[in-house]
Structures are given as structure tokens and as C-alpha cells.
Amino acid sequence: MKTFMAKPQDIKNRKWYVLDAEGKVLGRLAAEAARILRGKHKPDFTPHVDTGDHVIVINAEKVVLTGKKLRDKKYIRHSGYPGGLKVMNYEKLMKTRPELAVEKAIVGMLPHNRLGSRMAKKLKVYRGPEHPHQAQKPEPWQAL
């Protein structure tokens, strides 16, 4: 018996799933979303092929960080210029751009290569409960 390996041209029907982030812990939500984006929930999962589905995360502003992470956890970026380090704690980040905090958590759990970049393009994060993807007929994800 041979192990099944999916080929990129075999992946036809990708589904769209909606994850509601309201009241969910950021890391647990990110792990579940990354699992769907990679395709690990499917029986035809192949590590070197993008077999995953599309993920829409709504209510990103209502995601929860446990403990003192809201105050202590930092979002760090650098412009590339001397003295260009920008540091912001998650409390301020969640007030200004909560969709960025959720997106960074999910993308950080994907492979850090070209395959992971393609998977990240299937992720859509929205601050509130509305999203413009009704035409794709997304299904709610219940595994959380």
C-alpha cells in the first residue's frame, strides 16, 4: 500500500470557514486557524502541498489574551533605519489594529517559507462581525 501524496493540481474545491474570535483566547484561535489554513483537518493532507481552506476571522477586537499579556506582551517592528525600532504593547495594538494582532499570531504558526506565504493569503481578518465574503458561502467552524 502506498502513501497518498496530493499534487497541487488535485486540490480543487477549497471551502471557506468563518471563525468567530469573540471571547476566544488568541493563541488557541490562531492554532485552530493555522490548522485549517494548512489543511491538517483533511484526510488528504500533504506537508509539501497547500491543501488548506480559506479562513475568515470575525470579531478580532473581542479576542482575549490571558494573564498580564495585554500589558506585558510587545509588538515590535523595525523600519530598517538606525533608531527605527517601534515598540507597542498589545493593549494599545488591540485598541488601534486588533486585526493585525490576530493576523500576526496566525501567520506566525504557519511555515516560514513560500508555502506559508501562499497559505497566509487565504486568511482574512476583520475587526467586527461583518465581512464582504458572503458570495463564497462560508461555513461556521465549530471545532473551537
Swiss-Prot record:
GO CC annotation terms, alphabetical: cytosolic large ribosomal subunit
Keywords from the UniProt entry: Ribonucleoprotein, Ribosomal protein
CDD domains linked: Ribosomal_L13
Gene Ontology MF terms: mRNA binding; structural constituent of ribosome
Lineage: superkingdom: Bacteria
One GO term of the biological process aspect: negative regulation of translation
InterPro entries registered for this protein in UniProt: Ribosomal_uL13, Ribosomal_uL13_bac-type, Ribosomal_uL13_sf
Similarity comment text for this entry: Belongs to the universal ribosomal protein uL13 family.
Summary of subunit composition and partner proteins: Part of the 50S ribosomal subunit.
Biological role: This protein is one of the early assembly proteins of the 50S ribosomal subunit, although it is not seen to bind rRNA by itself. It is important during the early stages of 50S assembly.
HAMAP family: Ribosomal_uL13
Protein name, entry field: Large ribosomal subunit protein uL13
Organism for this UniProt entry: Pelotomaculum thermopropionicum (strain DSM 13744 / JCM 10971 / SI)
